[in-house]
């Protein structure tokens, strides 16, 4: 997963819920040095009996914001969506550099 162009990641989920699996996996895909490279990562853990829906919010360097439905999307779909926009930004960066 291309994380170079991601500036903000916010998650809210119940760690005991099966519906939050995609949000947990997405956080595990982020590199260990993401915070030191300028990415703002915010995680809010909900109590076990919470009925709030899980949330995954991603913001890119170009200002695009994505609110992803982690309850109904699998991790592959989420990574696809994020990578799709990251590849567009990568192409633009390559064109500007080249």
From Swiss-Prot:
<comment type="similarity">
    <text>Belongs to the mitochondrion-specific ribosomal protein mL53 family.</text>
</comment>
<keyword id="KW-0689">Ribosomal protein</keyword>
<dbReference type="GO" id="GO:0005762">
    <property type="term" value="C:mitochondrial large ribosomal subunit"/>
</dbReference>
<dbReference type="InterPro" id="IPR019716">
    <property type="entry name" value="Ribosomal_mL53"/>
</dbReference>
<dbReference type="InterPro" id="IPR042776">
    <property type="entry name" value="Ribosomal_mL53_fung"/>
</dbReference>
<keyword id="KW-0687">Ribonucleoprotein</keyword>
<comment type="function">
    <text>Component of the mitochondrial ribosome (mitoribosome), a dedicated translation machinery responsible for the synthesis of mitochondrial genome-encoded proteins, including at least some of the essential transmembrane subunits of the mitochondrial respiratory chain. The mitoribosomes are attached to the mitochondrial inner membrane and translation products are cotranslationally integrated into the membrane.</text>
</comment>
<keyword id="KW-0496">Mitochondrion</keyword>
<comment type="subunit">
    <text>Component of the mitochondrial large ribosomal subunit (mt-LSU). Mature N.crassa 74S mitochondrial ribosomes consist of a small (37S) and a large (54S) subunit. The 37S small subunit contains a 16S ribosomal RNA (16S mt-rRNA) and 32 different proteins. The 54S large subunit contains a 23S rRNA (23S mt-rRNA) and 42 different proteins.</text>
</comment>
<protein>
    <recommendedName>
        <fullName>Large ribosomal subunit protein mL53</fullName>
    </recommendedName>
</protein>
<dbReference type="GO" id="GO:0003735">
    <property type="term" value="F:structural constituent of ribosome"/>
</dbReference>
<dbReference type="Pfam" id="PF10780">
    <property type="entry name" value="MRP_L53"/>
</dbReference>
